[in-house]
């Protein structure tokens, strides 16, 4: 039976490069990763595949899963629910596959309450000036929105203490390599492997 995979929770401010670093990790790593598929109540768009792009559910089905405690984390955005289904994550982990969960800080804090032994990694910019330059460089937000994102980033960085690791994204390949090193080390953490080695030890004789 394969060892259980790691749940890797990956967060950071908007514009820090989470998606870019995550893609670099997937493309350059020899490890088997599964990018977590989210669940949503929004309408399925042309070309989207249920179970690949999202798990598409009705609002009633989603809310029932919430009541049953079957969502690792969830939020409502523009009238639709988005979240991470617990059953899907557990089934993947049980196959010995590491699950990569790229979510916002508030969602990560929800996950920490339910899966405290997950690996929590916070991706940081070198500094706030660099983060602002990246947001401006995307060319998708107004100056007002960028200012709001910077203020939000300050709040999120203040919550970094809730994470296990902080990785600076100064260069994408370097940041990806640092994350891979963290994941590799976590696979050898004593708390994760001790059960296997305890099985090798002789059992104490029963006291009469």
UniProtKB/Swiss-Prot annotation:
Places the protein is found: Cytoplasm
Location (main, coarse): cytoplasm
Gene Ontology molecular-function annotations: ATP binding; guanylate kinase activity
Entry-linked InterPro entries: GK/Ca_channel_bsu, Guanylate_kin-like_dom, Guanylate_kinase, Guanylate_kinase_CS, P-loop_NTPase
Catalysed conversion reaction: GMP + ATP = GDP + ADP
SMART domains found in the cross-reference section: GuKc
EC number per UniProt: 2.7.4.8
Keyword Kinase (UniProt): yes
GO cellular component: cytosol
Keywords: ATP-binding, Cytoplasm, Kinase, Nucleotide-binding, Transferase
Pfam families linked to this entry: Guanylate_kin
Binding site for ATP: 12-19
UniProt domain Guanylate kinase-like: residue ranges: 5-184
Family per similarity comment: Belongs to the guanylate kinase family.
NCBIfam families: guanyl_kin
PANTHER family: GUANYLATE KINASE, GUANYLATE KINASE-RELATED
Function field: Essential for recycling GMP and indirectly, cGMP.
The protein's name in its UniProt record: Guanylate kinase
Organism: Streptococcus pneumoniae serotype 4 (strain ATCC BAA-334 / TIGR4)
